[in-house]
Amino acid sequence: MMRATCLVLVFCLGGISWKVQAQSGRSREWLTWGGDTERTGWNRGETTLSKQTVGRLTLKWKTQIDKEVSIEIESGNSMLTAPLVAQGVRTPQGPKTVVYTLSASNTLAALDAATGATIWRRTFDHTVEPRSTANWICTNTSTATPVIDKGKNIIYMLAADGRLHGVDLATGEARLVPPPEFVTPFSRNWSLNLLDGVLYTTVGRGCGNGPVPGAPAPPPGTLRGGGTPPQRGDAAARAGGPPAQEGAPAREGAPAGDAPARGRGRGAAPPPVAAHMIAMDLNNPARPISRFFTSTARPNGAWSRAGLAWAQNSLLVQTADGVWNPPQGLWGQTLLRLAPKTLEVLDYFTPSNLEILNANDLDYGSGGTLGFTFQGRDLVVSAGKDGTVYLLDAKSLGGADHRTPMFSIKAGNDELSYASMGVWGAPSTFVNARNERWVYFPMWGPPSKEVKFERSNGDARDGSIMAFQVVVQGAKPVLVPRWVSRNLAVPDSPVIANGVIYAISTGENTLQRHTDPRYHAIYQKPGAPPLPKTGTMTAEERGQNTTHTILYALDAETGQELYSSKDLIDDWTHLSSITVADGSVYVTTRKTIVYAFGLGK
């Protein structure tokens, strides 16, 4: 069994989840990724921390979950999922607020939020073995943030072998027996979402013991799940869309044809797992599964940590590089609006610069999306690697041709870099006391020369949190750039509570390929043999030239720095997310340690 080593930070704060199962109102819990099914990242119930008090944050405790980790895992995966927080859990020691997190080694831990002491922990054994050796793209580990059903006193989690476990919040005892297989073993999945008893997640990056039941066969004459140009009169042509786009990269997050070898594993490498969304109806004792495939192989996967976001009685998700041909079921670089439970396509938006995105490995799916209502209008925001931020009409995402946004602004990545720039995390949103709607994006690299923010909080060459306000101009909603934060190297998904934005500078190494000139400038030593000029960097290389994670608290309306953890965190993190709940803030890093911060005296 693989062991992981991660680090989690907890900062004291109150949480809210306003549409997760029975949870509503001004709750102080955090039962799912992003705090609610909409993935807003907004803690509506926090009162302890404020702009006036957050500067007094101090380290309260830290707890390590696992002791060992494979380098292949730690350089390509989050080592602990975003912590979840439930109040009033009736443990054997009495009612407690409990913090839950899942490690890459299949260990689910429940910690006392007051002390960090372990209440219970369970490590789940594999029922099958992976057929490919691990690497930093396909880590063969648990990756999906669990979800809590407070009404049933159950936390649901996905083990690496694809089994869905439901365990008791108070004791860790199994409540879902036997655990059903939900996803393909050792596939890459993202945060679970639970709505009306139906569980959702995404499957991407081609990892796992394929093939997938019901996966479509590639169309004749195509490669890697690509498509042929639509015939005259088909749906895409009638909608005014371009022909299907060929030559899509073979995986998300890196250029075509350059994925690390998947290894021999235990026999011949399995076929790539076709990218898809998946739902399981937990209300039905048979637990039926629905799947919606976005390609026939590796391309077009969804890999936002938010997974599927709930909005306007539907589910929103963005896909990555790949062929776009809706009549053939190929959905590269597309924001999809899906029906609950059945996952049928209700609407979609595909950026008009699709060819540029695919040619430069600018995954639209690297960012995230969320929906909200503004002055009686249902809106959606989204962004990806190319740094363009979109504001869409939820009732018609891309207009008649599915390619025309209501509003867009180029906010970052002028260089069109496939790594180190653009949006690599989910947005967040909140409404302030003046009923103003704000939206925040984590942008890697400097702001675009095309965008002018009203306020800058310093040079942001490595990355920043960007704040936009939704306003109406000429009867049409638009995004107005209000402020850009201090430099963050690099930012991840921010969260909001009581007028304060919480953001991290991850400290990670964002380089990926040996072809990147920065790789040779940094890694080539005088007198040493020449470094490779092709291929993807190794896990060991990606683990070098890192710094350490820093937590910041910023004024949500100005970006002014209110707090910095400075050197309190001595490790870096990757694909991490902040949790805000019940007077604490939680952040994970690669050594599977949970840090808890709260107000000092």
Q: Language model features by range: what are they?
A:
Residues 1-2:
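N-terminal secretory signal peptides that target proteins for export/translocation
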Residues 5-15:
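Bacterial N-terminal signal peptides
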